[in-house]
Amino acid sequence: MSSEKEIQQQLSQMQGQGFDPEAQQRQEAQRQEANERRQGILIQILTPDARERLSRITIVKPEKSRQIEDLIIRAAQTGQLTERVDDAKLISLLEQLSEKTKKTTITMKRRTIEDDD
């Protein structure tokens, strides 16, 4: 009996601290719904080959895939896309994104100190 009381007490403390399981479930449901809408839009915009390529990119680099998806969806919503995005066009978009996000590398050459000992 006391363990049930302790559990209830801990649960009420967590809710008081901002931990609300129902709110988390609602947020998760909203995220899931938004993801389903996003996938539905991509299915309409991308050809099967382009979708397959994008799914392989998602496995390796999810952040790059997300950037490309955002770019494609934004272009479709603003009316910039007049036809479906095929594999060649997706490759072109990937190259453009790679050029924009190239990382600068800095090579440091350290001087060696000659010790007379």
From Swiss-Prot:
Q: For this protein, what is any one GO molecular function term?
A: DNA binding
Q: What is this protein called?
A: DNA-binding protein DDB_G0278111
Family the UniProt entry places it in: Belongs to the PDCD5 family.
Q: Which SUPFAM superfamilies match?
A: Double-stranded DNA-binding domain
Keyword Methyltransferase: yes or no? no
Q: Where is the composition biased (Low complexity)?
A: 8-22
Q: Where is this region: Disordered?
A: 1-40
Q: Where is the composition biased (Basic and acidic residues)?
A: 23-39
Going by the UniProt record, its keywords in alphabetical order are: DNA-binding
Name the Pfam families for this protein.
dsDNA_bind (PF01984)
**UniProt GO cellular component terms:** cytosol; nucleus
Q: Give the highest taxon in the source lineage.
A: Eukaryota
